[in-house]
């Protein structure tokens, strides 16, 4: 597998909608920056027989609205960008180093299969012990790296994936 570089990512964004909306200034030497979307799912109170239905509380943020992530809190968020990974590529999401230095952590589900289309759900937590983090729709949250596969898989996520075409922050489907 070989990683794509700036001009290859730019060409795929323009020709096949690899990442939309596409802004050329988001291109890095071997990745493209993505921004935080406007839907956040936070943990609700879990007690009683309705616990499974009330686990998540949805927050639909306006573009200028902030979400305060308290120390130790866990949320599901999503990228503003819609990603279309061709079947001959794979992708990985990584948090921007600036976000990590602030105490934000993205948990381990950063792999994006060949053939996936949709917004990327992000599993975020504040690892600070004392300080809140402010999240805002549109802020640069991470970057996507793309790798070219040596062969095209016999199965595509487009046919087998349970999170295909998702939009917004999506909890586990099992």
Language-model features, listed with the residues they occupy:
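DUTPase catalytic domain/fold
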Residues: 1-174
């Amino acid at each position: 597998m070989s990683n794509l570089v700036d001009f290859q990512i730019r060409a795929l964004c323009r020709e096949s909608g690899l990442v939309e909306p596409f802004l050329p200034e988001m291109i890095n030497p071997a990745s493209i920056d993505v921004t935080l979307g406007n839907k956040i799912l936070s943990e609700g109170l879990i007690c009683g027989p309705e616990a499974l239905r009330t686990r998540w509380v949805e927050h639909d943020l306006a573009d200028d609205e902030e979400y305060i992530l308290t120390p130790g809190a866990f949320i599901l968020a999503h990228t503003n960008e819609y990603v279309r990974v061709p079947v001959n590529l794979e992708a990985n999401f990584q948090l921007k180093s600036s976000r990590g230095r602030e105490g934000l952590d993205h948990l381990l589900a950063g792999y994006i299969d060949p053939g996936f289309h949709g917004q990327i759900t992000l599993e975020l937590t504040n690892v600070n012990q004392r300080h809140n983090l402010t999240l805002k729709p549109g802020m640069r949250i991470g970057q996507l790296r793309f790798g070219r596969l040596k062969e095209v898989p016999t199965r595509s996520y487009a046919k087998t994936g349970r999170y295909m075409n998702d939009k917004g922050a999506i909890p586990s489907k099992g």
